[in-house]
Amino acid sequence: YNLVSKANDQIEFSAGWGQTGVIGKLSLKFTNFSMKNFLNPKTYKGIIPQGEGQTLTLSGQTNGRYYQAYSISFMDPWFGGKRPNTLSVSAYFSKQTDISSNYLTNSGYGYGYPGYGYGYPGYYGGGYGYGSNYYGNYGYNNSYEYAYDPDKSIMMFGLAAGYGKRLNWPDDYFQFMATLNYQLYMMHDWDYFLVNNGNCHNINLELMLQRNSIDNPLYTRKGSQFMLSVAATPPYSLFDGKDYASMSSSDPDKYKFIEYHKWKFKAKIFSPLAPLTVKRTPVLMTRVEYGFLGTYNKNKKSPFETFYMGGDGMSGYSSTYAQETIGLRGYENGSIAGNGGYNSYGYAYSRLAMELRYPFLLEPSSTIYGLVFVEAGNAWTDLKNFNPFNLKRSAGVGVRIFLPMIGLMGLDWAYGFDEPNYGSNGKRSGSN
């Protein structure tokens, strides 16, 4: 039989207006793309060539003049055409700018003059409120939009190329993936962390071994997912002859070439609580995750690739360097690690969870299920302080909705039972 791949393209669009200007995101995902037929107009359906089951994703995001991000990725699940070997290539670029220092010193919250009256001087200033300030006159105004300072910026550029191969041993569910990554960070008067100016290069090789035996990616009733990965850069400090102990943390040359080794383990197990012949089978999902970021030289501890923990786990723009976002429902974003204070950088993390899922609708065109969960996790700035029993706990409820043209949407509400780590704003509950 001659089988023809069926397209399941997706488009994501959102737009709005905020105090920084236009806010929006546009993402196009073509799931039956054909690179081989790119120059063959007869194979085009719409604006792209189709027919080989390859995936092409284009994405753009903006938060006014303060943040823009663009990415493109290509994935061929049958590279070579004979075996399910995966080839992936991607590139991205983002730019974030800061606000003027005058705004920080001349604005405040609340009624009255900036930094005075019924309010207090905040890190991001007042913006809204009746009174006068550095950037406006009396009356209600939005000064944040006018505090834009293009001379303070961080730009990030990245490339990645990966190759994956399905293994026959120990069983057919195993897959091995190797990815070569390059990231360039270009900073100019970026005042938030150690490096304020200069360029930093991150060249690393990531090796990943995973096993996936789930029966359905949308509503999984049985099976498991295991993943073990390590990403490592060359150990520059072992052969470049530099005395990093005598270099200050703000010296751009200290982190010109970033070095680290990063280890991660993730596991999910799905257990049906009723016979699989029952259409609406409740499922118990258990999850375990650990992550560690190590160094070759104690005097060259990377501020990049650390763990940003807490909140919804959705990656977006921030004033920090490249960090891996780890969600912990029931706590504010970055309140466990990443928002400054004692846990500015997370070099180790642990996360455990149990979810009881029940399907309300299981149809080819849409899937809806609800869930209740308990979750616990924590992050540490030093590997020596890692303690898998010292965790921040939470519990909550949620819902997942899948629509073909939109994709998977989710809404969770959780309450955190423990105080966040020092340096956070202390908030624990809320929707994620």
Task: Give the location of each predicted region.
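Hydrophobic alpha-helix feature that most strongly marks membrane-spanning transmembrane helices
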Residues: 33, 79, 272, 336, ...
